[in-house]
Amino acid sequence: MTLDLGVLISGRGSNLQAILDAIAAGKLDARVRLVISNRAGAPGLDRAREAGVPTAVISHKDHPDRASFDAALVGALGQAGASWVVLAGFMRIVTSVLLDAFPARVLNIHPSLLPAFPGVSAQAQALAHGVRITGCTVHLVDAGTDTGPILAQAAVPVLPDDTEERLSERILAREHALLVHVLAAIAAGHLTVHPPTTVAARARVELVGVPGALGVETTND
């Protein structure tokens, strides 16, 4: 099936670019219906415009609370015809208003091997803890902070001379591939969502017929 995507960004939009490039190359059966940024100057908006994708700026500062901000996002996404939402460097915590409008159809890419190092500055957290391997995770979004069901992960070794900047750039390259990998699997019908069986439970997700991870990055350094 062709995925109708709404992509939410806050910055440079490199993961958005990976999606656009994969679509253009015929590697991803999807259409980006709308790119929304909460920041007017986000460079990712230019990436979308260059690809002929509609854009919108919806500032969180123009809304009194998170719920009303998310309601504005839902309205714009619905009008554009999006049925899946990708948080691609979107630096806002979403609420049930957005999640209920797109049940089990909101994805996020996070720069760690969750559940390790959730929240902001995951790369710095990895370095501070002295781990030897970190990476990135694509997961469905739920009401928690980076706690939703994991769809796929890719590992990146932490090198002895890594700085936060160097590690971040190497993880980012893996993010691009992993996000496209997961979206392509969803488009191919390999995503199964099992609804929660109790109020306290949460949805269980399976990606079937495809690898759940892209493996460990290799390096010649």
Sequence positions of predicted segments:
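Donor/substrate-binding cores of folate-linked one-carbon enzymes
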Residues: 22, 88-202
